[in-house]
Amino acid sequence: MTQIAYFDCPTGIAGNMCLGALVDAGVPLSYLEQQLQRLSLSEPYQLVATPVLRQGMAATYVEVQIEAAPHAHRHLSHIVALIEAAGLPDRVRDWSIAVFQQLAIAEAAVHGVTPEQVHFHEVGATDAIVDIVGTCLGLDYLGIEAVYCSALPTGGGTVKAAHGQLSVPVPAVLRLWQLRQVPVYSNGIERELVTPTGAAIAVTLAKSFGPPPSLQLQKTGWGAGSHDLPIPNLLKLWIGTASDLVMTPQSPEGSLETVQVIETQIDDCSPQVLAYVSEQLLAQGALEVFSQAITMKKGRLGTLLTIICQPDQQAACETILFRETTTIGLRFRREQRRVLPRRRDRVQTPWGEVRVKVAGDPQSPLTVQPEYEDCRAIAQAQQIALHHIQTVAQQQWQQENA
C-alpha cells in the first residue's frame, strides 16, 4: 500500500513546522542530526526540538540555532553541489534539489533573471537548507511515497527581508502558488503564514492541494510555528496508507467513496488514439473512462474525455493523457460516488460455466448480470443467440439463490 503524508496547514507552512511535525510523528532527532552533518555546512548550528503548547495544544517546535549571526548567501549551483556531495539517500537528494530548483524558478521570475543567476538570501541560509533537507530526510525515513497538502492561508501585513520591507504573501511565495495554481484563502490573520521555504516544500513535493486523500490514518505529528496566533499555530501531519475506499456506514443504497474526476476537451485526436488512451488509462487503474461528442469553439467537433480514478492514481493518469494525447490542459475535481456492494458468483449452464456479477444486499440483490465475455464465447461456440445465453444464466442464478 502507498504510504501517504498529508500536510494540514490551517495557519500556514514553514520549514521548521514541517520538521517539528515529522519529529512529533516519530522521526528521531538524532537521525536528522546525523544525516544533516553530511552536508558539511560551514556555519555551526544546533538542531533543537522542544515540546510546546499552542493555545493549549501540545506540539513539537524545532529550531535551527545558528551560532554565528551572519549567514552565507548562495547561488543554486552552490546548494546543489552541497547536496550532491553529501551522500544522502537518493530520494532525499532528488527531493531536496527539486525544492531548491523550484524556488530558484520562482525567484528568477520575480527578479527578472535566470534561475542560475538567483542569489539566495534567506533561503540560502543554513537554517533554510537544514529545514528543506531535514524535511526530505524525515519523509524518506517514514517511507512516504506520496505527499498531499491542504489549501494554504494567504496571511497579511508585512515582513522584513533582505530586499527590505515586503507585503505578505511575499513575491516568491505568490509566484510559487501561481506555478502550481495552489488554492489559497484568507483566515483573517495578519502575519506571514507561508514562508518561501514552506511554500517551496509544498509546491514541489505535494501531488495535489485540497481535502485529504483517501487513507487509513496510522499516526499524526504536530509541528508548532514560532508565534502564538488567535488559533493554534500548528501544522498537522497525517501519515497513513492509501485506501481504495473511504466509506460512510453501510446503507441499503451502498457506500460512499471519494474519487478523482479528470476531464479534457480534444478536437485533434483520431478515434484510434482515443481508444488506445482509454485502454492505457484502464490498465493504469482508472475506474471509468468515457467520452462524449461536443461542439467546441469555432463550431469544431470535439471529444470530452472523462476519467474517474482513485485520488492516488491522478498523477499517473495525467501522465498518460499528456503523453498520449494532444491536450495541453486538464481539469480535475474531487467527487463522491455511491457504490453497491458487489461480488462474483458462478453458475453452470447447459453449455458451460458463466460468471455472474451480483450487486446489492446479499439477501436481496438489486442487479444480477451474467458476464458478457463468458456469454459471448458460448454464443459463438454453440451458435446460440447471445440474449438466450444471458437469460438462461440469470435464471440459473435465481434458482440457485432462491
Curated annotation (Swiss-Prot):
Signal peptide: none annotated. GO terms for molecular function: lyase activity; nickel cation binding. The keyword Thylakoid does not apply. Keywords: Nickel. PANTHER family: NICKEL INSERTION PROTEIN-RELATED, PYRIDINIUM-3,5-BISTHIOCARBOXYLIC ACID MONONUCLEOTIDE NICKEL INSERTION PROTEIN. Belongs to the LarC family. This is Putative nickel insertion protein.
